[in-house]
């Protein structure tokens, strides 16, 4: 079913962990979902996060599929296959860490490790109805992950429940010390962003049920940060993968995106860095007034596979609410919330102060406990 690109057992008898195939495991090739790396030699050493998983006595169960070169949000991959979204088989699994999210949602792994450059952990987690964390930039080692250089990308965990996700952070993030859930006094800023009204209503109801006090909030440069984030992604991905274009080695969608990325100017990058600084300060200032910031992970249900293949605008709408926090570097967690009418799970995003991943996870756990109690 294309969730895994290779299945094997490595390590102890602890929790089952799936690893995205853009992260090195010694003895196994890292192909990043691309024909361009079909003949890649086996990695000679483990990525830091893989070594941490093995040191904890956990069991790696295989390498998971992804959107080619981790440069896409649908998870559709015509070379290595497209994972099935376990909660909605007619809809995209999300990308780029599609197989990682699908493996956890299908119960094939307790935890998965992915990467998030512009939403690539949070988007598939939300699509597949599980939890996923983009840690504070730099908090979790990227050594052994592709691309080798990125000012946006973060290695992060997926899990069906917050207890497992927190356990994963304890393993892959040195110094991660879980915090107890707060008792009262949680004042959250719910960002005023464009999304389907019924989706926002469901998420706000879950927040109310948790006993959190919420207030609407607007960030002036939120939309600009989305565009600036793409500018930075384009420059960095062209530097990493531009040499693969024009050779028939990569899929048409990724080839087109890379060629478009090649036209990014130095002036555009400079402007994006100005937005990065300004928006980061805006988020920092907002977090002085609120415990965390909240917003939907996706503005709508994931597009169907048919919509995605037909180039629907729904695909372009998958990342506006996640990419800004790659640009700013703040930790951002998506927690599943069940829609009353359909039974599908959508994502509520929790954004915290830099370095306070533990606090973000504590609130995520509290929210999930409240949701379970009210079901």
Predicted regions and their residues:
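Structural helix-boundary/capping segments
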Residues: 55, 106, 110-111, 115-194, ...
């Amino acid at each position: 079913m294309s969730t895994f690109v290779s299945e094997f057992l490595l390590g102890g008898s602890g929790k089952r962990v799936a690893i995205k195939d853009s992260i090195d495991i010694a003895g196994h090739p890292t192909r990043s979902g691309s024909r361009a790396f079909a003949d890649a030699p086996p990695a000679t050493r483990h990525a830091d996060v893989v070594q941490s998983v093995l040191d904890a006595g956990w069991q790696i169960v295989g390498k998971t599929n992804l959107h080619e070169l981790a440069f896409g949000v649908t998870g559709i991959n015509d070379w290595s296959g497209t994972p099935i979204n376990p909660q909605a088989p007619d809809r995209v699994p999300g990308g780029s860490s599609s197989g990682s999210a699908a493996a956890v949602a299908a119960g094939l792994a307790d935890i998965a490790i992915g990467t998030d450059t512009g939403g690539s952990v949070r988007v598939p987690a939300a699509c597949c109805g599980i939890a996923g964390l983009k840690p504070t930039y730099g908090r979790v080692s990227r050594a052994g992950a592709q691309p080798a250089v990125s000012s946006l990308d973060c290695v992060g965990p997926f899990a069906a429940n917050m207890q497992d996700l927190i356990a994963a952070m304890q393993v892959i993030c040195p110094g991660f010390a879980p915090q107890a859930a707060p008792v009262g006094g949680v004042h959250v800023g719910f960002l005023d962003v464009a999304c389907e009204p019924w989706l926002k209503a469901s998420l706000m109801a879950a927040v109310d049920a948790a006993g959190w006090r919420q207030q609407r909030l607007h960030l002036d440069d939120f939309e600009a940060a989305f565009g600036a984030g793409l500018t930075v992604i384009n420059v960095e991905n062209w530097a990493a993968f531009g040499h693969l274009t024009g050779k028939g080695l990569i899929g048409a969608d990724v080839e087109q995106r890379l060629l478009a990325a090649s036209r990014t100017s130095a002036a555009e990058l400079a402007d994006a860095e100005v937005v990065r600084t300004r928006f980061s300060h805006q988020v920092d200032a907002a977090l002085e007034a609120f415990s965390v910031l909240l917003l939907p992970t996706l503005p709508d249900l994931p597009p169907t596979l048919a919509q995605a293949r037909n180039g629907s605008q729904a695909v372009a709408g998958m990342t506006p609410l996640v990419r800004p926090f790659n640009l700013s570097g703040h930790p951002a967690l998506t927690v599943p919330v069940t829609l009353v009418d359909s039974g599908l799970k959508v994502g509520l995003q929790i954004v915290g102060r830099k370095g306070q991943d533990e606090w973000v996870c504590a609130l995520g756990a509290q929210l999930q406990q409240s949701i379970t109690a009210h079901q």
